Amino acid sequence: MNKLTKIGVSALCGSLASVAAANAGSMDVTGAASATYTSLSDTVVGNPLGMATSMTFTGNGELDNGSTFSVSIAHNNKAAYSSSSIALTTPSIGTFTYDEGGGTGIDRIDDMMPTAWEETWGTAVGTGIQTVSGVGGGMNINWTSTADMGGLSIHAAYSPQAKQGSGTNDKASSGVNATSMGSGYDIVLEHSGLMDGLNIFAGYSSIDQLTTGHTEGDRTATAAGATYAIGGATLGYQVSKDSLNVLAGVNHYDNQAYGVSFAVNDDLTLSYGVHKSKQNHTNSAKDAELEASSIQVSYSMGGATIKLAQTDVDHGAYDSSSATDRSGTTLVLSLAF
């Protein structure tokens, strides 16, 4: 990916380049644009043509003690911003990240299956699937261990008010929404040093939940799985559970996913994946299982990538009837700069 280093930034602020130089830092701008075509069977749709754009600002620098810092702000599809983070990496105790929307905690392993393009459920066909997110659903502080632990990585995230939105202004706090949730934490372990090509991962999340006439304990989530790469092929399997712990209604979700990808060469990749999710009610007669499967192909030509996905969804949005079953094809041309 080519970077537009400091060009766009100086256009935003003429004095920013001199400020960056004085602090031994830099600001880079990267972006992408995608043209899409989506066709759904057995579903009434509007115009199948679509477009997506993104722009990411990344700044970094170094302190006198050898610690480094970075900031990342992502803008997607005309949004004010989609995600942002401020990180401080120390030489000995790891990286501390102040994060909003960047996939921290257990959210980083909600779907780790190998793919040529997107998650099985993320190809614009629409599934309504519920995956684990933990405190990554709002502003949180994340710590990642140093890289010299024999292939073991530890990620810990904490939020003083989970799933309560974010304070995006200077010295501001988020608003309060109608939720009974309090503080929460996530812990994730990843290990890639046991054998060549093998990566195993596991995570746990717990969020304080006010015990009321509707709930009966804290909201918890777990996830575990592994991927194994051999030659150009990568295989993966994982399970996860999101426990809402309510007395009536949807009590928890049980998910399992598996997939395989194959890199034919440096430019062409193929994949097949399945993600199943069972919605469990306190009244088991209302239980429903959603299943999404997707065959994907991606082909890169320098800064351009063509992506194709054929996705089938059974019982979308956990509808036990066949009314929400759908099949769709998505074709994307992505241009990166």
Give the role of each language-model region.
Residues 1-337:
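Outer-membrane beta-barrel proteins
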